[in-house]
Amino acid sequence: GCCPPQWCGPGCTSPCC
């Protein structure tokens, strides 16, 4: 699943971030 937008960035490994 995708990270919520506030989680995207350094440390987020989701391909949709």
UniProtKB/Swiss-Prot annotation:
Protein's cellular compartments: Secreted
Entry annotated with the keyword Secreted: yes
Tissue specificity of this protein: Expressed by the venom duct.
Origin: domain of life: Eukaryota
Keywords of the record: Disulfide bond, Hydroxylation, Secreted, Toxin
Residues annotated as signal peptide: none
Transmembrane feature ranges: none
Reported modifications of this chain: Contains 3 disulfide bonds. They are not indicated here, since framework III presents two different connectivities (I-IV, II-V, III-VI and I-V, II-VI, III-IV).
Predominant location category: secreted
Modified residues (4-hydroxyproline): 4-5, 10, 15
Family, as annotated: Belongs to the conotoxin M superfamily.
UniProt free text on domains: The cysteine framework is III (CC-C-C-CC).
Protein name: Conotoxin Reg12a
Protein species of origin: Conus regius (Crown cone)
